[in-house]
Amino acid sequence: VIDGKGCRSGAVVERKKLSQWFFDISKFADNLQEELNNLDEWPNKVKIMQQNWIGKSFGCEIEFKIIGDPKIKKIKCYTTRPDTLFGFSFLAVSIDHLLSELYKNDKDFKKFKDECSKFGTTEESIANAEKIGFKTKLLAKNPLDEEKTVPVYFANFVLMDYGFGAVFGCPAHDQRDFDFAKKYKLEIKTVVKPINENDDFKVTNEAYPGPGIIINSDFLNGLEAPNKSIIETIKILEKKNIGKKTINYRLKDWGVSR
Protein backbone atom coordinates (compact mmCIF):
# COMPACT_ATOMS: atom_id res chain seq x y z
CA VAL A 1 0.00 0.00 0.00
CA ILE A 2 1.46 3.36 -1.08
CA ASP A 3 -0.35 6.60 -0.25
CA GLY A 4 -3.56 4.67 0.41
CA LYS A 5 -3.47 2.84 -2.94
CA GLY A 6 -2.46 -0.63 -4.11
CA CYS A 7 1.14 -0.54 -5.35
CA ARG A 8 0.28 -2.49 -8.51
CA SER A 9 -3.31 -1.64 -9.40
CA GLY A 10 -3.46 1.92 -8.11
CA ALA A 11 -6.87 1.13 -6.62
CA VAL A 12 -7.87 2.95 -3.43
CA VAL A 13 -7.42 0.66 -0.41
CA GLU A 14 -10.41 0.62 1.91
CA ARG A 15 -11.48 -1.39 4.93
CA LYS A 16 -15.03 -2.75 4.72
CA LYS A 17 -17.11 -5.28 6.64
CA LEU A 18 -17.90 -8.38 4.59
CA SER A 19 -19.72 -11.67 5.17
CA GLN A 20 -17.04 -14.36 5.12
CA TRP A 21 -16.42 -18.01 5.89
CA PHE A 22 -13.76 -19.09 8.39
CA PHE A 23 -12.16 -22.29 9.62
CA ASP A 24 -12.34 -22.13 13.43
CA ILE A 25 -8.68 -23.06 13.91
CA SER A 26 -8.10 -20.74 16.87
CA LYS A 27 -9.79 -23.38 19.05
CA PHE A 28 -6.86 -25.68 18.37
CA ALA A 29 -4.05 -23.24 19.16
CA ASP A 30 -2.70 -25.25 22.10
CA ASN A 31 -2.85 -28.52 20.17
CA LEU A 32 -1.03 -26.98 17.22
CA GLN A 33 1.65 -25.62 19.55
CA GLU A 34 2.16 -28.95 21.35
CA GLU A 35 2.26 -31.05 18.19
CA LEU A 36 5.20 -29.06 16.86
CA ASN A 37 7.34 -31.05 19.31
CA ASN A 38 6.41 -34.27 17.48
CA LEU A 39 7.46 -33.08 14.02
CA ASP A 40 10.94 -34.59 14.17
CA GLU A 41 11.59 -34.41 10.43
CA TRP A 42 10.52 -30.78 9.99
CA PRO A 43 13.30 -28.19 9.61
CA ASN A 44 13.80 -26.25 12.83
CA LYS A 45 13.36 -22.89 11.07
CA VAL A 46 9.93 -23.98 9.80
CA LYS A 47 8.86 -24.98 13.31
CA ILE A 48 10.00 -21.60 14.60
CA MET A 49 7.91 -19.93 11.90
CA GLN A 50 4.91 -21.97 13.02
CA GLN A 51 5.50 -21.04 16.67
CA ASN A 52 5.60 -17.36 15.73
CA TRP A 53 2.44 -17.76 13.65
CA ILE A 54 0.60 -19.31 16.60
CA GLY A 55 2.11 -16.59 18.78
CA LYS A 56 1.39 -17.94 22.24
CA SER A 57 2.19 -15.33 24.89
CA PHE A 58 1.75 -15.09 28.64
CA GLY A 59 0.48 -11.82 29.98
CA CYS A 60 -2.21 -10.05 31.92
CA GLU A 61 -5.73 -8.74 31.39
CA ILE A 62 -6.14 -5.33 33.03
CA GLU A 63 -9.24 -3.20 33.61
CA PHE A 64 -8.80 0.55 33.33
CA LYS A 65 -11.41 2.82 34.89
CA ILE A 66 -12.61 5.47 32.45
CA ILE A 67 -13.89 8.94 33.27
CA GLY A 68 -15.51 11.46 30.97
CA ASP A 69 -18.64 9.63 29.79
CA PRO A 70 -21.10 7.58 31.89
CA LYS A 71 -21.62 5.14 29.01
CA ILE A 72 -18.04 3.90 29.24
CA LYS A 73 -16.88 2.93 32.72
CA LYS A 74 -14.07 0.47 31.96
CA ILE A 75 -11.80 -0.58 29.13
CA LYS A 76 -10.00 -3.90 29.28
CA CYS A 77 -6.66 -4.56 27.61
CA TYR A 78 -4.11 -7.35 27.33
CA THR A 79 -0.40 -6.78 27.92
CA THR A 80 2.75 -8.83 28.28
CA ARG A 81 4.37 -6.07 30.35
CA PRO A 82 2.08 -5.09 33.23
CA ASP A 83 5.20 -4.22 35.24
CA THR A 84 5.61 -1.01 33.22
CA LEU A 85 2.28 0.45 34.37
CA PHE A 86 3.94 3.30 36.23
CA GLY A 87 5.24 4.46 32.84
CA PHE A 88 1.73 4.44 31.37
CA SER A 89 0.99 7.72 29.52
CA PHE A 90 -1.89 6.92 27.16
CA LEU A 91 -4.52 4.29 26.41
CA ALA A 92 -5.06 3.47 22.73
CA VAL A 93 -8.00 1.60 21.22
CA SER A 94 -8.84 0.27 17.78
CA ILE A 95 -11.12 2.29 15.49
CA ASP A 96 -13.41 -0.78 15.62
CA HIS A 97 -13.57 -0.80 19.42
CA LEU A 98 -17.00 -0.49 21.07
CA LEU A 99 -15.90 2.99 22.14
CA SER A 100 -16.24 4.12 18.52
CA GLU A 101 -20.04 4.10 18.93
CA LEU A 102 -19.71 7.25 21.03
CA TYR A 103 -18.04 9.02 18.12
CA LYS A 104 -19.98 7.66 15.14
CA ASN A 105 -21.51 11.09 14.47
CA ASP A 106 -18.29 13.02 15.01
CA LYS A 107 -17.08 14.42 11.66
CA ASP A 108 -13.43 14.54 12.73
CA PHE A 109 -13.54 10.93 13.89
CA LYS A 110 -15.12 9.86 10.60
CA LYS A 111 -12.24 11.52 8.75
CA PHE A 112 -9.74 9.78 11.01
CA LYS A 113 -11.43 6.41 10.48
CA ASP A 114 -11.42 6.92 6.71
CA GLU A 115 -7.72 7.75 6.89
CA CYS A 116 -7.02 4.58 8.88
CA SER A 117 -8.95 2.45 6.38
CA LYS A 118 -6.38 3.37 3.74
CA PHE A 119 -3.61 1.58 5.61
CA GLY A 120 -2.94 -2.13 5.20
CA THR A 121 -4.18 -4.46 7.94
CA THR A 122 -1.17 -6.78 8.20
CA GLU A 123 1.20 -6.42 11.16
CA GLU A 124 4.00 -5.50 8.75
CA SER A 125 2.04 -2.71 7.04
CA ILE A 126 0.87 -1.31 10.37
CA ALA A 127 4.40 -1.43 11.79
CA ASN A 128 5.72 0.54 8.81
CA ALA A 129 2.88 3.07 8.70
CA GLU A 130 3.04 6.45 10.41
CA LYS A 131 1.48 6.21 13.88
CA ILE A 132 -1.57 8.45 14.04
CA GLY A 133 -4.23 8.97 16.70
CA PHE A 134 -7.54 10.65 17.45
CA LYS A 135 -7.79 12.06 20.96
CA THR A 136 -11.07 11.43 22.77
CA LYS A 137 -12.49 13.42 25.67
CA LEU A 138 -12.02 10.42 27.95
CA LEU A 139 -9.36 9.78 30.57
CA ALA A 140 -8.10 6.45 31.89
CA LYS A 141 -6.99 5.93 35.49
CA ASN A 142 -3.75 4.14 36.22
CA PRO A 143 -4.85 0.96 38.09
CA LEU A 144 -1.76 1.11 40.32
CA ASP A 145 -2.15 4.83 41.04
CA GLU A 146 -5.70 6.06 40.48
CA GLU A 147 -4.74 9.68 41.12
CA LYS A 148 -2.90 9.52 37.79
CA THR A 149 -5.04 9.84 34.65
CA VAL A 150 -3.99 9.71 31.00
CA PRO A 151 -5.73 10.50 27.69
CA VAL A 152 -7.56 7.89 25.62
CA TYR A 153 -6.86 7.78 21.88
CA PHE A 154 -8.08 5.87 18.88
CA ALA A 155 -4.91 4.72 17.11
CA ASN A 156 -4.22 3.17 13.72
CA PHE A 157 -1.74 0.64 15.14
CA VAL A 158 -4.22 -1.11 17.46
CA LEU A 159 -5.89 -4.21 16.02
CA MET A 160 -9.35 -5.19 17.22
CA ASP A 161 -8.62 -8.90 16.81
CA TYR A 162 -5.64 -8.89 19.21
CA GLY A 163 -6.41 -8.98 22.92
CA PHE A 164 -9.36 -6.65 23.50
CA GLY A 165 -8.60 -4.09 20.82
CA ALA A 166 -6.95 -1.82 23.39
CA VAL A 167 -3.37 -1.29 24.58
CA PHE A 168 -1.79 0.84 27.27
CA GLY A 169 1.11 2.93 26.06
CA CYS A 170 4.45 2.94 27.87
CA PRO A 171 6.59 5.08 25.54
CA ALA A 172 9.89 4.65 27.36
CA HIS A 173 9.93 0.90 26.75
CA ASP A 174 8.16 0.32 23.44
CA GLN A 175 9.35 1.99 20.24
CA ARG A 176 5.87 2.21 18.70
CA ASP A 177 4.56 3.90 21.84
CA PHE A 178 7.65 6.13 21.91
CA ASP A 179 7.01 7.36 18.36
CA PHE A 180 3.34 8.00 19.17
CA ALA A 181 4.19 9.89 22.37
CA LYS A 182 6.73 12.06 20.56
CA LYS A 183 4.18 12.93 17.87
CA TYR A 184 1.47 13.92 20.37
CA LYS A 185 3.80 15.35 23.04
CA LEU A 186 2.88 12.81 25.73
CA GLU A 187 4.88 12.00 28.85
CA ILE A 188 7.79 9.57 28.45
CA LYS A 189 8.57 8.19 31.91
CA THR A 190 11.40 5.70 32.34
CA VAL A 191 10.50 2.77 34.61
CA VAL A 192 13.16 0.19 33.65
CA LYS A 193 16.90 0.85 33.72
CA PRO A 194 19.66 -1.42 32.39
CA ILE A 195 21.36 -3.29 35.23
CA ASN A 196 24.61 -1.33 34.85
CA GLU A 197 22.91 2.11 34.90
CA ASN A 198 22.11 4.41 37.83
CA ASP A 199 18.56 5.13 39.02
CA ASP A 200 18.62 8.49 37.23
CA PHE A 201 18.76 6.71 33.85
CA LYS A 202 16.34 8.29 31.35
CA VAL A 203 15.10 7.25 27.94
CA THR A 204 15.66 10.09 25.48
CA ASN A 205 16.20 9.27 21.80
CA GLU A 206 14.61 5.82 21.55
CA ALA A 207 12.73 3.32 23.69
CA TYR A 208 14.57 0.86 25.92
CA PRO A 209 12.73 -2.50 25.66
CA GLY A 210 15.46 -4.59 27.29
CA PRO A 211 15.81 -6.24 30.71
CA GLY A 212 16.93 -4.44 33.84
CA ILE A 213 15.68 -3.11 37.16
CA ILE A 214 12.36 -1.37 37.87
CA ILE A 215 12.66 2.32 38.87
CA ASN A 216 10.25 5.24 39.41
CA SER A 217 7.52 2.74 40.23
CA ASP A 218 6.77 3.06 43.94
CA PHE A 219 6.38 -0.42 45.48
CA LEU A 220 7.79 -2.19 42.39
CA ASN A 221 11.16 -0.42 42.61
CA GLY A 222 14.20 -2.69 42.68
CA LEU A 223 12.53 -5.72 41.11
CA GLU A 224 14.36 -7.54 38.32
CA ALA A 225 12.59 -6.94 35.01
CA PRO A 226 10.89 -8.50 33.26
CA ASN A 227 10.60 -11.89 34.99
CA LYS A 228 10.20 -11.06 38.69
CA SER A 229 8.50 -7.70 38.12
CA ILE A 230 5.79 -9.18 35.88
CA ILE A 231 4.95 -11.91 38.39
CA GLU A 232 4.76 -9.43 41.28
CA THR A 233 2.63 -6.93 39.32
CA ILE A 234 0.13 -9.61 38.29
CA LYS A 235 -0.18 -10.70 41.94
CA ILE A 236 -0.98 -7.11 42.94
CA LEU A 237 -3.54 -6.64 40.14
CA GLU A 238 -5.23 -9.95 40.98
CA LYS A 239 -5.39 -8.99 44.65
CA LYS A 240 -7.10 -5.71 43.66
CA ASN A 241 -9.45 -7.73 41.40
CA ILE A 242 -8.62 -5.53 38.39
CA GLY A 243 -6.37 -7.90 36.48
CA LYS A 244 -5.49 -11.54 35.98
CA LYS A 245 -2.83 -13.72 34.41
CA THR A 246 -3.87 -14.98 30.98
CA ILE A 247 -2.64 -16.50 27.73
CA ASN A 248 -3.10 -14.89 24.34
CA TYR A 249 -2.51 -16.05 20.77
CA ARG A 250 -1.70 -14.26 17.53
CA LEU A 251 -3.36 -17.12 15.65
CA LYS A 252 -6.73 -16.16 14.18
CA ASP A 253 -9.45 -18.11 12.41
CA TRP A 254 -8.63 -18.90 8.80
CA GLY A 255 -10.65 -16.88 6.29
CA VAL A 256 -11.43 -18.88 3.13
CA SER A 257 -13.59 -16.47 1.12
CA ARG A 258 -12.11 -14.01 -1.37
Q: Language-model segments: what does each one mean?
A:
Residues V1-I75, A166-R258:
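Residue patterns forming the tRNA-binding/recognition surfaces of aminoacyl-tRNA synthetases
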Residues I2, K71-T80, T149-F154:
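Short amphipathic beta-strand/extended segments with alternating polar/hydrophobic composition
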Residues S19-Q20, T79-T84, F154-L159, L220-N221:
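A short, sequence-level motif marking secondary-structure junctions
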Residues D24, T84-S89, M160-F164:
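Short, surface-exposed linear segments at secondary-structure transitions and domain or protein termini
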Residues S57-E61, S89, K135-K137:
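Short glycine-rich loop/turn motifs
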Residues K74-H97:
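Conserved phosphate/anionic-ligand binding catalytic regions in large, soluble enzymes, centered on
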Residues H97-I195, D200-F201, E206-Y208:
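Catalytic alpha/beta core of large soluble enzyme barrels
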